[in-house]
Design a protein with these regions (language model features):
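Interdomain motor-coupling "hinge/lid" segment immediately C-terminal to the ATP-binding subdomain
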Residues: 1-72
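A cross-kingdom feature that marks ATP-driven nucleic-acid transaction machinery
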Residues: 98, 105-239
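Extended hydrophobic/aromatic segments used for targeting, binding, or gating
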Residues: 54, 62, 85-89, 93-96, ...
C-alpha cells in the first residue's frame, strides 16, 4: 500500500493533469506561469484552430457543432451521442456518418461503440449507430465545456483542484479514462442492458478484450463505493 498521503498527492497531480491536459503549448504555459487562466487562454486558441480546420472540411459548420456538444452530451448521461441534439433533425444518416468519419479522422476525438453482445466479442457485435464521443485531450475537454463562458465561471477547475472528490464530475473522469485507454492502444466499447424491472438500464462505461475474456470498467469520480452496473454485468456474464 502507498499510504493515504502518497495517494492524495498522486490524485492531486492527476487532477492537475486533467485540468491542464497534455497539449505541449498548454503544458509549457503552465510550467512557465503556474497560472490556469493563461493555460485556459492557450487551450481556447487550440480549439479555435481545430474549428478553423473543421470549417475547411465542412463549411456548413456541422463538424464544429458535433465537436462542441461533446461535453454537454456526456454530462447528460445519455446512453448514446444524440446527433439530433447537435445538428437538428434534418441531416440524413449517410451525411451524418460522413461528418463523424471526418471528425474521427481528425484525431481530435475518441469514439466508443456499443457492443450489443460482449459474449461473442466486441468487434463482432458493435452497433455503428450507437456510440459516444470523447475529446482526445482532457484539458481541451474542460475548456470546451465552458467555451462560451469566462474562465472564472468554469467550476470544473475549482472542483478538480480542491481535495474534495465531486460526484458530479463523473463525465469529466469518463473522458480522461477514454483518453488513457486509447493511448494504451485499446479500442473503446461500452455496454448497456436493462435492469430486472426493465424500467432503467445498467451501463458499463468501457469494455476491454483480453484474450477470451471481457474486462468491464466502471468510472467513479467520488468516494461512492456502489457499482450496481458492474455487479449486474459480472452476474450476467459469469458463466
Amino acid at each position: 500500500s502507498m499510504g493515504d498521503a502518497v495517494t492524495r498527492k498522486l490524485m492531486r497531480d492527476f487532477r492537475l493533469y486533467m485540468a491542464v491536459g497534455g497539449m505541449p503549448q498548454a503544458v509549457c504555459e503552465y510550467l512557465e506561469t503556474n497560472n490556469l487562466l493563461d493555460v485556459d487562454r492557450v487551450k481556447r486558441g487550440i480549439i479555435q484552430l481545430y474549428e478553423y480546420d473543421f470549417y475547411r472540411l465542412d463549411q456548413s459548420g456541422r463538424i464544429s457543432m458535433l465537436f462542441d456538444t461533446i461535453p454537454a452530451q456526456l454530462s447528460s448521461n445519455a446512453s448514446r451521442f444524440q446527433v439530433a441534439s447537435a445538428l437538428g433533425d434534418n441531416v440524413d444518416s449517410e451525411k451524418t456518418l460522413q461528418l463523424i468519419s471526418e471528425l474521427r479522422e481528425s484525431k481530435t476525438i475518441n469514439m466508443a461503440y456499443h457492443a450489443n453482445d460482449p459474449a461473442v466479442g466486441m468487434p463482432l457485435s458493435i452497433d455503428l449507430k450507437k456510440y459516444k464521443m470523447f475529446v482526445a485531450d482532457t484539458g481541451l475537454f474542460i475548456t470546451l465545456a465552458f467555451k462560451d463562458k469566462d474562465f472564472t465561471e468554469n467550476v470544473i477547475y475549482q472542483k478538480l483542484l480542491s481535495d474534495k472528490l465531486d460526484a458530479n464530475l463523473g463525465y469529466v473522469y469518463e473522458n480522461v479514462v477514454a483518453q488513457m485507454l486509447t493511448a494504451a492502444g485499446n479500442k473503446l466499447f461500452y455496454y448497456t442492458f436493462p435492469t430486472s424491472t426493465g424500467k432503467h438500464n445498467y451501463e458499463v462505461d468501457f469494455l476491454l478484450s483480453r484474450g477470451n475474456k471481457v474486462c468491464p470498467i466502471e468510472v467513479k469520480s467520488s468516494g461512492y463505493k456502489r457499482h450496481a452496473s458492474l455487479d449486474a454485468f459480472c452476474e450476467k456474464f459469469s458463466s
